[in-house]
Amino acid sequence: MELGKGKLLRSGINALYQAIHPVHGLAWTDGRQVVLTALHLNNEEPKFGNSIVIGQFEHVHGLYWGPFLANDTPALLAVQHKKHVTVWQLCYSPSDKNKLVVSQTCEIGDPFPVLPQGCTWHPSKDILVVLTKRDVSVLYAVRYENSSLKADIKSSGLIHCACWTKDGSRLVVAIGSALHSYIWDSKQKTLNACAFCPVFDIGGYICAIESTVDSQVAVSTELPLDRICALNAGIAFTMPASSEITISNQPGLLLMEEEFSMDGVQKSADSGSLTTDSLATSPATLDLTHIVNHSKADLNSLLNLKKKDYLTGSGQDSSHLILVSFEKKVTTTRRVSIPGILVPDILAFDPTAHIVAVASNTCSAVLVYSLTSSSVPNIQQIQLEKNERPKGLCFLTDKMLLVLVGRQKTSDPAFLPSSSSDKYLIRLMVKEVMFDEDSSASSGGNTSVQASNDSCMSIQDKKKMVESLYKESPSTHRELLLPSGTAPPTYLRKKKLIEEIRSYDGDQSPTSSANEFDEKRNRLRMESFDTEPKNCSVTLSLDMDKKPISGSTSPKSECQNSSPPNFIQPSDVSPQQEILSISRNVERLCCNFAHLQQHLSELTDITRNGKRPLSASYLPCRQAPYVTVVCQDAYHPEGPAMKRSILLCENKLRLGTVQELFGLSLIEMQLGPSLWIILTGDSEGFIPLTFLANQEITIRDARIAAMHPPLRMDRNNSMQPSSSVT
């Protein structure tokens, strides 16, 4: 359903959060108008009806329906503006059932702007929470007055988002990387900090929060920029598609899910090794992409090279979806990585199917996860168009996901946006959440059995369970195990956190593969190029030296030797050749950056002048505009001078050319019989003057002239040095 043009916030919003009312339908805004669209479900199929405009303001950033109490109770709608929030009451007229009566009940303002997702209603009471970056205000009598109270924030950090738990007993506020928990006292009308868990740090900057079931919330954390730079994603490797990894030759596995408790002890298995006993913590979905086992020698190497992770880019870290349960005396969490989305600031949860949708206002992908008892496997990925962004998510049923899509205009990525909002073409899209019953039953069934019988499982049973997980889907051994038994889409497998810089001719360089085996025998080798790549990108690979014959071998090495290798055998290359190959590729990389700098300079000219200088605008050779530069000897001004003719560039002369031509670092130019000025350069290196064609100018060394200025005779017959102006 097309909604037309609208101006929405760029990031941090879920425009469909608390946006659907059972009676009045969908509330949405184009940035100025408040619009209600009828929405009905016929046999679980959504049907959109007529739309009416009930208000128009200068700025509307969000709309939130209050809890549905009864059919005869007027509905409450919170309208979020820039620095204030108004609450409106809607009901149909008793005399005319088709006439909608709208009246304002209360309003709250703040010196600070309201956060993008700045309002959240209590699930069962007329209590509204308004958020700014510094304050949490609770309006507990929205139908009658503007009475409110502010939470006692024990932190100097910035507030980002908040939500009520599903049971309504707790308000969870996200401040930085910590969750601040508050208990609402309905009798005293107070908000008190939780006694057993007032603050719970989850170790990542929180983007969004959503209540799930009972006292549990789902939290998404972003991948910070400093972590992206620390991942060395630019020198990670890409495994060939034919290199299938089996369980028999893996030195270690990393559990996808991590569990934490209030004591701060990490319960999940370490990435360095995995014993069968550690499966009791999380016997469910395994992340088979983090299989590299580094030794201490690898950590001390000059280049710490890693295998490319098809899901997160480098195999080290990613944004995360975290489940936090606030129980009576303990707080526990479980987490799963979110591939391909750096800032997941949109969350939506369906309580019937126990599934959560994750998206970002800056990414065109939507991921759907299933909240099972012991794991959070990725079950579906929805891919939008390249210039489309999800601006809101909401589950209509357990199988229908409503997506508010904003289509952006093509913008110049070289410049950061100056405004917090942008114009979009808005439309509503309904996507069906697909379930593969056979694979879901097998995967989900195994998960439930593992969760319930985990304490009584033997070591042998755990081994069989892990082997069965690998055998179910051979094509996903190096990727995330999906309940449907299929590999993640190509978008997720090849998504990179840091895109490689390509030259403008569009050619692609050949790529090589990385295979990591025994950590003590890995060595770095630079593959030589068969052809010269135009973009001068570097291709790296790891190869294994030939192992010496020994009397005894470990079971791990026997498994590795028994399996046929799926990689290119290294050739005998001397260390000198390797060093030469490395130096050549470094030179190619520097060449690539030089070309990039040249293109950036051209882009700067285009943005400043509004057009690209075309060769068609050049003058013929016979009409070449040039100036004759006469370099005068500072010691002997009347002596012979050096002359050079220099071509003008749009009547401009480049200072560096003159300096290099005459070997002068500081130059003076003669403007009159006794006036000399020292030349400087602008941001582009040109002398900030225009010259005429066939003009002759006189210059000299300014340093020598300053030490030995030529003398002249004034009116009083006294000797005075000639003037010099800078």
Swiss-Prot record:
The gene is wdcp. Disulfide bonds: none annotated. This is WD repeat and coiled-coil-containing protein. The lineage of its organism: Eukaryota, Metazoa, Chordata, Craniata, Vertebrata. Residues 581-609 form a coiled coil. It comes from Xenopus laevis (African clawed frog). WD repeats lie at residues 55-98, 154-194. Residues 502-574 are annotated as: Disordered. Residues 517-533 have a biased composition (Basic and acidic residues). Keywords: Coiled coil, Repeat, WD repeat. Residues 506-515, 550-574 have a biased composition (Polar residues). SUPFAM superfamilies: Tricorn protease domain 2. Pfam families: WDCP. One of its GO terms (molecular function) is kinase binding.
